[in-house]
Amino acid sequence: MIRLFIDTATKTFALGARVDDKEKTIDLGNPKKVLELTHVGIQKLGEERNFTRPEIKEYYCLLGPGSNTGIRLGLTIPRTVYAMDPTIRIYGIETRKLLSAEADSAVLSDRNGNLFYFDKDRKESHIRIRKEDIASYPFKGTIAVEDSDSVSKEALKGKNIVSVNVLSLRRKHKDLFIDFSDKEEEYLPEYARKI
């Protein structure tokens, strides 16, 4: 089975494919060109791993908050495919839940350099922290930071950070993802359901 991972919540827009036991990730770069580059990225992954878009049966998305508006963009790609092929499965997870699966808390920066703090024990989904307040913020335990998030890593220098790869976490914590496949009425526009 071919699985596609769509990372819309970290600093770079990335696609990752898992075919059998082999993985490949590509960075699509400029978030402003994401929708135009997605098809090209999927095609490139397919050429490198010998599959075509119709063979992708599972889509995994980060739902934000984060750099590229999370749920809006993260689910737009697979739900467009879903409108044409309702047999695909769509899974999503809040970025904080995935990152926090590896540490006591997590920090993620968006493309504007804002920092978001997630703590497993807090009721709020996230707290926005100014860079100048990082040094005095009472972090607890280990802090998960995405591998490519240089803004968060720099701001947290000297703190107990754990660098994580979201594609690897998707594989490791698949059970944490929410299955949106049978809930299309909750996220698919009405006109698409009538096609």
Predicted ranges, named:
Residues M1-C61, T142-V145:
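N-terminal beta-alpha supersecondary unit
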Residues M1-D20, I90-I195:
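Oxyanion-binding and handling regions
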Residues D27, R72, R128-I129:
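Short linear motifs in exposed loops
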Residues P31-V34, S67, L99:
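Alpha-helix N-cap/loop-to-helix initiation residues
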Residues L37-V40, R72, T76-T80, K97-L98:
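Short amphipathic alpha-helical face segments that pack within enzyme cores
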Residues Q43, R79, K153:
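Short glycine-/small-residue-rich flexible loop motifs, especially phosphate/cofactor-binding loops
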Residues E58-I90:
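DPxDG-like acidic metal-binding loop motif
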